[in-house]
Design a protein with these regions (language model features):
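N-terminal lobe/hinge region of extracytoplasmic solute-binding protein
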Residues: 10-67, 98, 174
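Aromatic- and charge-enriched surface segment that lines or borders ligand/interaction sites
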Residues: 61-106, 122, 128
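Gly/Pro-rich hinge or "lid" segments in bacterial periplasmic/extracellular proteins
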Residues: 38, 46-50, 145-223
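Surface-exposed binding/hinge segments that line
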Residues: 109-161, 178-185
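Short helix-initiation/N-cap motifs at beta->coil->alpha
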Residues: 114, 174, 226-228
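Short, low-complexity disordered leader/linker segments with a strong preference
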Residues: 1-6, 117-118
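Short, well-ordered beta-strand elements
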Residues: 5-16, 71-74, 96, 127-129, ...
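Short, solvent-exposed loop/turn elements at domain surfaces
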Residues: 17-27, 52-55, 137-140, 189-192, ...
Length: 228
């Protein structure tokens, strides 16, 4: 792919990509657990698999319930930026959950509507979830615990402009994770990701140092090449 080997992390994949150039996790037919979106994705809560504990990623805390766990208030982490320079804030979180709730062609829609009554913006960095019943396992359900989650936060200023998010490929995705798409094989055999110039404003840069112990002079691989 033309990158220096000492700057490139190579990841072997088990199968080719079914829809080359498709980087929208909510497009119909997407397999959420395949892994090709993970370097770009943003989630309310991530998982430290070594410690066996969840921690806030897009969220700034583990959420605050009311007395009977029918309402959850979640603070959103300040300082995160999308790769186009826009701030990631409550608008993106509210939009993502309502997009899922309101679109029955999204796989997680039915389960989301089963438990969540409404999602509201309190202020630019606070979101309130009203549940349909007592729901104490909120962070486990809507964050990562094992392989991933159906709830990946998308940029409201991009996805709100799409007529149908389930047919939108998102070939040049705006992301909150540390890597953007540099190139991909039109036959689906490989994808090349590049570290954002502003990766310190990504989920890894803002959150990762607290959980993975790297220092300011340590920089992730410039490129990651997923190949079949």
């Amino acid at each position: 792919v033309g990158t220096n080997r000492d700057e490139t992390l190579v990841v072997e994949t088990q199968t080719p990509t079914d829809t080359p150039g498709q980087f929208n996790s909510y497009m119909s037919g997407t397999t959420m657990g395949f892994g090709i979106h993970q370097l770009m994705s943003a989630h309310l809560w991530e998982m430290d698999t070594v410690a066996g504990e969840q921690y806030p990623e897009v969220a700034a805390d583990m959420g605050t319930p009311n007395e009977d766990f029918t309402e959850w208030t979640v603070k959103i982490r300040q300082g995160l930026k999308w790769s186009d320079g826009e701030d990631l804030n409550a608008d993106d979180v509210v939009f993502t959950f309502n997009m899922i709730k309101e679109n029955d062609k999204i796989g997680a829609s039915a389960a989301t509507n089963l438990y969540i009554d409404k999602v509201e913006k309190v202020d630019d960095y606070t979101v309130k979830f009203t549940m349909k019943e007592s729901f104490p396992r909120f962070t486990q359900r809507y964050g990562i615990t094992v392989w991933g989650t159906d709830y990946r936060i998308v940029p409201e200023h991009i996805y709100s402009q799409q007529a149908d998010v389930t047919t939108y490929k998102d070939e040049k995705p705006v992301v909150a994770g540390p890597y953007t798409v540099e190139d991909y094989d039109p036959n689906g055999d490989w994808i090349l990701y590049k570290l954002r110039d502003d990766w310190q404003d990504s989920t890894l840069g803002v959150v990762g140092a607290d959980h993975y112990g790297y220092t300011a002079d340590q920089v992730p691989a410039k490129y990651v090449w997923f190949r079949y």
